[in-house]
């Protein structure tokens, strides 16, 4: 892994390593270390798994909880602080469900895909031949290993861990019912337009200091608020403008910059519709086409449920139901072939989502 690759990864995850060997280790699979010696990322995965649980619970308590009393602390220049009992807007079951969604395998794997960093995995020959980097479990492991490496490199700096988790995971998409997830929209647009993901550069800034405002590019700027601590510059392949957003965290700054980019694309009539994504909707490719739309953020990964019955002659008949979390409709396929039943259910669902648009 060279310096250019390390810089790209650090820009994407929103953290700069003091000890870059930890970052390289986070990307090193056991298959490589078995063949070449050195340390792999398995212990970092273990550390990152525990760190992820902690920072996600911390985030949930901050987003949905508050204390029963407030007071002004005059020893801190009248700063408003909280005390008393802790009150949560969500109950234990609701918090547990959100946490479960945030830390599950598919969520972490999707985050690695959105960051575009699985390509940099360091693998042994067997893993390379099997294209193991495409495995959901491997991407999940990579996410946890990176967070574990950050935990060690930062000496367990909770703010650094939470910051990086927010940048990598974008948890607001699951915690809040936003009309538009600007980060995901821009990532999907860039991938569809150029095959590449946007680049993110983060800079510390404050009302007391000098705002980060690059002058060497055409830029569109967000609005800086009083409690702003970070700037994020988003660069989209094929777009001349750079977009600079501000926020009290790196994640909020990235969201602001992505919003600016989204509004620019919308004003320029450059946004794709769901119909633009699939050139030729057809029965034979329907399963893959439906998954492409899901991977690009239009809806969740389709779920297929199968049931085998038999006709009067005892021949197998397969029934397949296709459902999508965000859609009320369930489509059905029926065939003597399990694969064809799945295709029929997928094609009917594909037709439904395209017509719905």
Swiss-Prot record:
SUPFAM superfamilies: dsRNA-binding domain-like (SSF54768), RNase III domain-like (SSF69065). It is an enzyme of class 3 (hydrolase). Its main location: cytoplasm. Pfam families: dsrm, Ribonucleas_3_3. It catalyses: Endonucleolytic cleavage to 5'-phosphomonoester. Homodimer. Residues 6-155 form the RNase III domain. The keyword Kinase does not apply. Residues 198-267, 285-355 form the DRBM domain. This is Ribonuclease 3. Disulfide bonds: none annotated. It is found in: Cytoplasm. GO terms for molecular function: metal ion binding; ribonuclease III activity; rRNA binding. One of its GO terms (biological process) is tRNA processing. The keyword Nuclease applies. One of its GO terms (cellular component) is cytoplasm. SMART domains: DSRM, RIBOc. Digests double-stranded RNA. Involved in the processing of primary rRNA transcript to yield the immediate precursors to the large and small rRNAs (23S and 16S). Processes some mRNAs, and tRNAs when they are encoded in the rRNA operon. Processes pre-crRNA and tracrRNA of type II CRISPR loci if present in the organism.
